[in-house]
Amino acid sequence: MSRGIIIIGSGFAARQLVKNIRKQDAHVPLTLIAADSMDEYNKPDLSHVISQSQRADDLTRQLAGEFAEQFNLRLFPHTWVADIDADAHVVKSQDKQWQYDKLVLATGAAALVPPIAGRELMLTLNSQQEYRACEIPLRDAQRVLIVGGGLIGSELAMDFCRAGKTVTLMDNAASLLASLMPPEVSSRLQHHLTDMGVHLLLKSQLQKLEKTEAGIRATLVSQHSIEVDAVIAATGLRPETALARRAGVVVNRGVCVDSYLQTSHPDIYAIGDCAEINGQVLPFLQPIQLSAMYLAKNLLGGNAPLKLPAMLVKVKTPELPLHLAGETQRRDLSWQITAESDGMIAKGMSGEGQLRAFVVSEDRMKEAFALLKTLSV
């Protein structure tokens, strides 16, 4: 008798995998176990909740029970998995255990919080649950410090500014989106945020946070300090690998998987923000959607290696939206930038004259798909 497939996690990756499995097999036993409520919400919406005056509960799209009924699943919400016995094919919580034929880790990633004095005063916005815990102080805060000038930090800075709050955006780097693109490309967004009223503290490092009568005092390594009402950590994500380690599978930055999404144990797989696919962590929606399609086939007896095409990453900054693709972080590319009032096209060219990366903004985003076709991957 088939013991079926167990998926640990309930986020976008887990749900996409369930849908793809059920397209091919309506009856294989499917069990989902997760520490949260398992209600569905759209995680990218977290970048816009403040300007749109949304409460955490407004983000819910489908209740867990409806999802279970629609896709013929067993769900175990609010359940912490304590251990995995890979040899016995058993998943254990404090008071239950489940046997499986195939196990999928879809445990996601946790928000990184800088290890500074007063770090407990920092808020994170990496899940509906985290937003629910801090929505009142964030709604009431007038002065907000966002630590981290990457994708999420830039999106949140624009959103909080659009909501009428006084926003300071801090980063160690000399420019925004520094891990994604060179400053000559990100400068358009940087200037726009400044024009909106966002105060940028670049080449700056936070030293400590202290509670005061007036709110929170943030002190920089330079000893400069600012008073704010709320501090948000947007310094990146750390793949959740603790369960994989307990199961004895190989872990690096994320849970190491091959092109079949298979870990070092033949019956354990990983997908989504927790997975490191052939050395790459890809915490974006499109790679997860494609991973779910291929993994569903492989869990049901197929042997299909994941093939990822050139893909767009969208920066959700509505007043100056950006699309990027390719190896935008490469430092050896020569950038050809055309900037006009209706938008920007920046092309990253290799020494051989090949298009290796591009960034487009505003009305020039309509040219992204044509550029994708000419991108060398």
Swiss-Prot record:
Pathway info: Nitrogen metabolism; nitric oxide reduction
Cofactor section: FAD
UniProt GO cellular component terms: cytoplasm
EC number annotated for this UniProt entry: 1.18.1.-
Gene3D superfamilies (UniProt xref): 3.30.390.120, FAD/NAD(P)-binding domain
Compartments where located: Cytoplasm
First-tier enzyme category under EC: oxidoreductase
Family: Belongs to the FAD-dependent oxidoreductase family.
Its job: One of at least two accessory proteins for anaerobic nitric oxide (NO) reductase. Reduces the rubredoxin moiety of NO reductase.
HAMAP family linked: NorW
Protein name, per record: Nitric oxide reductase FlRd-NAD(+) reductase
Organism whose genome encodes this protein: Salmonella paratyphi C (strain RKS4594)
